[in-house]
Amino acid sequence: MSDWILSIEGTPAGHTAAMILALTAALLHAIFGSLQKGRIDPWLSRGAIDSAQVLLALPLALFLVPWPEGHEWLLVLGALPIHFCYKVGMALAYSRGAFTVVYPIVRGMGPVFTVIGAYLVFGETFSLTQWLGVLALMTGIFGLAVYNLKTIKVDRDTLVPALWLAAGTGGLVAVYTTYDAFAIRGTPNPFTFLAWFFVVASVDMPIVAALRWRRMTDRPPLARLVRLGVTGAIIAFGSFGSVMLATRLDKVGEAAVLRETSTVFAALIGWLVLRETVGPRRIALMSLIAVGAVIVELGG
């Protein structure tokens, strides 16, 4: 598999594969986000997911992929503090604000800063047409957040800090996307970085969750946390793994923009699975997000 990934890197086939991977990551990330903002405390849910990630990824890292060498260990370890800050930001935002408001803002902040980061780190550039696509996509995402903000009835007393936390966490999305792209490109075998990333960058939140668990009086059933953790870990492998491979194969900025169509998938999940009302305005905003992504993809 790694030989095939390396063989199509920087080719038209690689571009197509990167597009498919980024869209797959978008769908899976929407599902992943809804799991963390479920009925279980977001700190516990993230801890359960990360615990499962360590247990599932460790055998792969130890026995199925080449071990990191020299500077590759530094690349893997460098992801830990960045992703820890991101996960803390997400948990803080989710514990204070509604998912339908927090999630679009976090994802909406990422694309423009990632495109700038990709320019500074990798020398990537966007055409004027692609920037117009980014503008359309971000307008749709933030429009969706504003619409949800006006209609929600829960968590309104803590909404302002939730919005600030969501905006800051969105900036961290750009930081970790750029860093992960740099790291996976600096590792000869991309699956070496992926396997060890899911081990090393997942050891922190289980500790935080365990400390929180000890202080709780109304604890959720352990079996429920285990099911959530395993399900979330498998989805995370597909989501984060797909977008990282996409940034290895093609432009980081384009992969980041396509991934943010996850807000469309999140709204569709709410409509089809949770039976939430969509309405013409949300349909128009989701269409704008999709159109923006198409413009970015075709305008390069």
Annotate each language-model stretch with its function.
Residues 1-3, 57, 115-119, 129-148, ...:
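Hydrophobic transmembrane alpha-helices of multi-pass small-molecule transport proteins
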Residues 1-81, 87-99, 146-167, 199-231, ...:
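Membrane-interface interhelical linkers
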Residues 82-83, 95-144, 192-200, 252-272:
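Specific alpha-helical transmembrane segments that line the substrate/conduction pathway
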Residues 178, 242-259:
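Alpha-helical transmembrane segments and their membrane-interface junctions
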Residues 159-185, 189-192:
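Selected transmembrane alpha-helices and immediately adjacent juxtamembrane segments
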Residues 21, 28, 52, 82-85, ...:
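Hydrophobic residues within membrane-embedded alpha-helical segments of Major Facilitator Superfamily
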Residues 59-65, 118-123, 183-184, 271, ...:
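Hydrophobic alpha-helical transmembrane segments
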Residues 53, 91, 103-110, 169, ...:
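Structural signature of transmembrane alpha-helices in multi-pass secondary transporters
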